[in-house]
Regions:
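C-terminal segment of classical bacterial N-terminal signal peptides
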Residues: 1-5
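Compact beta-sheet-dominated domain cores in extracellular/mature segments
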Residues: 6-428
């Protein structure tokens, strides 16, 4: 799989300018592309209603169900687990509003474009975008942080009702879309099949004209009415035949692609996937291992790296994947409730002395190994470990050789609800 060019890696995803109320702005982020933010630069999130195994959770349109009341019982959404069970650490548990502060609207605020105002149960006013009430996350500390939620991992119907960042539409002609991946913001067509560019083409000029080339590479045709816009231009292949180009590079689909969002075409010499912006750089000491399933991220010795994902079964659907969350969830999966066994099987990925991160998405945090809680850097007895989106990453002792991924999908519903997942850069 070819990587993005240096120019593409540094480029930022263009977006449509949309009307916004005073006090809001758009910020470019490493993982999510352009997102809406408040006056302090805090990313805005939505919590759309989602169908779970046994009911629904999340905000219906034009209504917030995130309340300033501590939920104490499970909701029974993930059958066969019953509702009404006590949630862990109730003495420390916080309300939905404490973790997800609503974006409050002033009494004199007026709707603007797709921005509307909803009334909360306590009478306060809250901003909504496209009918979805908006929130900030207590996890975000700096402008441009997106630690509260991500659109990156699509884990299916067994996932919690997740919060995700909200942003303006990407600046695209009809027939295209952008998909978030670990490699970057991937450009695909409206059927979610990858588009590609060729090193043999010139600026706004296609050199794929032979029958041999055109049997494998299909020009992405532009309609007669298509007009250049922003980073998009139109190439005249022949009289009446027009082709889309992005950043002056003519676009193609690959006739041998059998799956959506494929990287197979980039295996052909001189051909590359296209990214609206490149992805965050993983730690320099990490490696990429070729496996029977695809390309997986690994640490310096080739051991697969995993992230932990967790959402509780309350009506609030709060995440439980951070080190400040109740650790009972992780202990149940990684060690059957046995702390020592968990630490024997799953290990934090240590950061070497002097190692630094080249991105904001990957960071080095300090952890107290006796409590698994994050502590201040340099605290006596702490260890420096790698984290993705503020959450530590792990290796699994069951992986004996580079490229093994025995820990992938370990947990409830293949790790989608509460468990461990590998960082797949490519699936074959």
């Amino acid at each position: 799989m070819s990587s993005a060019s240096a120019a593409e890696s540094s480029a930022r995803e263009a977006y449509d300018k949309v009307p916004m109320p005073p006090g809001f702005k758009v910020i470019s982020t490493e993982l999510e592309g352009p997102v809406f933010a408040d006056s302090r630069g805090r990313t805005l999130y939505k919590w759309p209603i989602a169908s779970l195994r046994n009911g629904y959770a999340g905000d219906p349109k034009d209504k917030s169900v995130c309340e300033d009341k501590v939920t104490t019982k499970t909701g029974g959404f993930m059958s066969p687990y019953p509702g009404g069970l006590d949630l862990p650490d109730l003495d420390k548990r916080k309300s939905c509003v404490a973790l997800w502060p609503p974006v409050v609207a002033d009494a004199k605020a007026k709707p603007v474009g797709d921005w509307t105002i909803v009334k909360r149960s306590d009478g306060t006013l809250q901003w909504a975008y496209d009918h979805q009430p908006l929130y900030t996350s207590h996890l975000d500390q700096s402008p441009g942080d997106t630690l509260g939620g991500t659109t990156l991992f699509r884990r299916g119907g067994d996932t919690p009702a997740e919060r995700t960042p909200v942003g303006p539409p990407t600046a695209l002609p009809p027939g295209f879309r952008v998909e978030g991946t670990l490699n970057g913001r991937l450009l695909v067509n409206d059927k979610r099949y990858s588009v590609y560019v060729s090193d043999q083409d010139g600026p706004n000029k296609s050199n794929c004209t032979t029958d041999v080339c055109l049997q494998r590479w299909l020009p992405v045709l532009a309609p007669e009415t298509a007009q250049p816009q922003g980073e998009w231009s139109v190439v005249q292949r022949s009289p009446g035949v027009r082709q889309w180009a992005f950043r002056k590079q003519p676009l193609y689909t690959y006739s041998r692609d059998t799956r959506m969002m494929s990287y197979d075409g980039s295996d052909e010499p001189g051909w590359h996937n296209v990214f609206a912006q490149g992805g965050p750089k993983h730690p320099r000491s990490f490696t990429v291992q070729n496996t029977t399933y695809g390309d997986v991220l690994a640490e310096r010795n080739g051991k697969t790296v995993y992230f932990y994902t967790c959402g509780d079964d309350s009506s609030d659907q709060l995440s439980c994947d951070t080190l400040e969350s109740p650790q009972q969830y992780r202990m149940a999966i990684c060690g059957g409730g046995d702390w020592a066994r968990c630490h024997q099987l799953w290990h934090f990925v240590p950061a070497a002395a002097g190692e630094k991160s080249d991105s904001r998405i990957w960071s080095i945090i300090s952890v107290d190994p006796t409590t698994d809680r994050q502590v201040s850097a340099g605290q006596a007895g702490s260890v420096r470990v790698w984290a993705f989106r503020g959450r530590p990453v792990y290796t699994y002792s069951g992986d004996k050789e580079p490229g093994e991924f025995r820990g992938h999908s370990m947990g409830e519903w293949q790790g989608r609800r509460n468990g461990f997942r590998a960082f797949w850069l490519r699936v074959i």
